[in-house]
């Protein structure tokens, strides 16, 4: 049994490598060798690439077309058998589909294909004149539309949430000095906002791949002295005073703020930071609601696809049963 390429392309390739071409549906297709040669002549690269949004297991990226035998198996996997009755309805449908595949390969400007996308395009090209495929295409297009919107929202929400997290770290530091009625230095004696531990990370590489780090690396830096040597940090003042973030720059910043019962500048500073981040918090709530809505629509499209496939299989099975019973 060959596992579906949509779920895990690595498993699909592993299964294909274990079988002979002769065991695949399209091994005897009259156009198999022609399509293999066409892919080679057009320098089309088909690859499997790990996608963390789709794949549960990590695997190494791999160019499939480097292995001609494997390429032949991929094409034989989706190609149907030649029609027994030449000139009949099925044969005409099949020939039209193969013609579309050839036209697509010859005319498409894209020569770099991820396996999932290539297989989907080949499938639709082969069967584009069938009403069931038209319905499937509408559903899949809906899935892709909502999927793309969901991905963009996730990326935006990750950035917004990361900036809000940095503000929460700053607010916690301010509150610590407020509770002790002390003085906070936000310049050369500031905490280093580049410290991964502030955000709950223990691994430096994971932190460098985080949304927080991507924001912080755009910030200006302050040079401080540590044990007689220079070290660069991203101070609270660097972050708050920078334009390179969603909330923009906070102006007129001092190097330090002290607690004073009569004129509590530290408390005022805490309020200013809170006010600065409040619209960001509102935006995170708004985007979270939008993401929930778009995810619901995406899941509904998947559910519709599953229901359609189940219904289609049921109808086809009944037709086959009726035919065999005659």
UniProtKB/Swiss-Prot annotation:
Q: Where in the cell is it found?
A: Secreted
Q: InterPro entries, from UniProt?
A: LowCa_resp_V_Ag, Vir_assoc_V_ag_sf
Does the record carry Transcription regulation as a key word?
A: no
Its domain of life reads: Bacteria
Recorded source organism is Yersinia pestis
Identify the coding gene.
lcrV
Task: Name a Pfam family for this protein.
Answer: LcrV
**Principal place of residence:** secreted
Record protein name field = Virulence-associated V antigen
**SUPFAM superfamilies registered for this protein in UniProt:** Virulence-associated V antigen
Q: Does the keyword Secreted apply?
A: yes
Q: What role is this protein assigned? A: Possibly involved in calcium regulation of YOP expression, which includes the export process.
Q: Which UniProt keywords apply?
A: Plasmid, Secreted, Virulence
Q: An example Gene Ontology cellular component term from the record?
A: extracellular region
């Amino acid at each position: 049994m060959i596992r579906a390429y949509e779920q895990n392309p690595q498993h699909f390739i592993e299964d294909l490598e274990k079988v002979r071409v002769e065991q695949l549906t399209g091994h005897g297709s009259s156009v198999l060798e022609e399509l293999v040669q066409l892919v080679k002549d057009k320098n089309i690269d088909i690859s499997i690439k790990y996608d963390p949004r789709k794949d549960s297991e990590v695997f190494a990226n791999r160019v499939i077309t480097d292995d001609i035998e494997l390429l032949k198996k991929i094409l034989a996997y989706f190609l149907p058998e030649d029609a027994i009755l030449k000139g009949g309805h099925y044969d005409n449908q099949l020939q039209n589909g193969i013609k579309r595949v050839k036209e697509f390969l010859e005319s498409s400007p894209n020569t770099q294909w991820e396996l999932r996308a290539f297989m989907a395009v080949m499938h639709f090209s082969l069967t584009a004149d069938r009403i069931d495929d038209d319905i499937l295409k509408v559903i899949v297009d809906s899935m892709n539309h909502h999927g793309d919107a969901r991905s963009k929202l996730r990326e935006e929400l990750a950035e917004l949430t990361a900036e809000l997290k940095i503000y929460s770290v700053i607010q916690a530091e301010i509150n610590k000095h407020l509770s002790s009625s002390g003085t906070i230095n936000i310049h050369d004696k500031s905490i280093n906002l580049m410290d991964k531990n502030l955000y709950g990370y223990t691994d430096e590489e994971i932190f460098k791949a985080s949304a927080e780090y991507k924001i912080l690396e755009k910030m200006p830096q302050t040079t401080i002295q540590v044990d007689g040597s220079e070290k660069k940090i991203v101070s609270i003042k660097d972050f708050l005073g920078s334009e390179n973030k969603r909330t923009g720059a906070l102006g007129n910043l001092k190097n330090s703020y002290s607690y004073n019962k009569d004129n509590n500048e530290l408390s005022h500073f805490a309020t200013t930071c809170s006010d600065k981040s409040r619209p960001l918090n509102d935006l995170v709530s708004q985007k979270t609601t939008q993401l929930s809505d778009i995810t619901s629509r995406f899941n509904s499209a998947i559910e519709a696809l599953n229901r359609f496939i189940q219904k289609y299989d049921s109808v086809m099975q009944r037709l086959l049963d009726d035919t065999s019973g005659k």
